[in-house]
Amino acid sequence: MFIFIKHGDNQQFLANINCSVLLLLHYARRKVGLPKTETIDLCDETGTMKLFFLMKTPGDYANKFLTARNTYYVCKVERGAPGTRVESAYKAFVPLLKNPEPELIDALRTQCDLLERSRVKMLRIQEAKKVVPIESSVNLTSKSSGRSDEEGTTRRAPVLKTRADFVSRKDKHR
């Protein structure tokens, strides 16, 4: 089973999809003359990215994700500058075509924006999951050695609230 991959100035080549996604991308990268360090992906004629560069298992066969005899375009995935705060940000999906259709560019831009918003949202969720100590006004007194409450040492302890604390409260009110 083969697909057509277009690039450059209306150039195209055949690619066998009875191989791993990783091997297919290495082959496509070599055919279009990009270095191994460049991140690429394929999109169909409507501009729908296949998001192979995000795959957890690049050893999966490409024929699971691509349709035989269809045409796909090579796209370069542009990320933020290395060593900066935005190095993992998605900047653009650039089709490696001399004159890409405006509809294709719009579809790729929309997908890139959605992917970047999703990435930022996941970062915010991960930061929110970090347990932050909440100062409590509860004083814990030491009741050892038979001292009275006035003589006891007091200390403030942070109260940590987890998701389980909130769930158990809801269940009590039912």
Curated annotation (Swiss-Prot):
Residues 162-174 have a biased composition (Basic and acidic residues). InterPro entries: CXorf65-like (IPR039471). One of its GO terms (molecular function) is RNA polymerase II cis-regulatory region sequence-specific DNA binding. GO terms for biological process: transcription by RNA polymerase II. Residues 138-174 are annotated as: Disordered. It comes from the Eukaryota. Pfam families: Il2rg (PF15874). This is Uncharacterized protein CXorf65 homolog. It comes from Bos taurus.
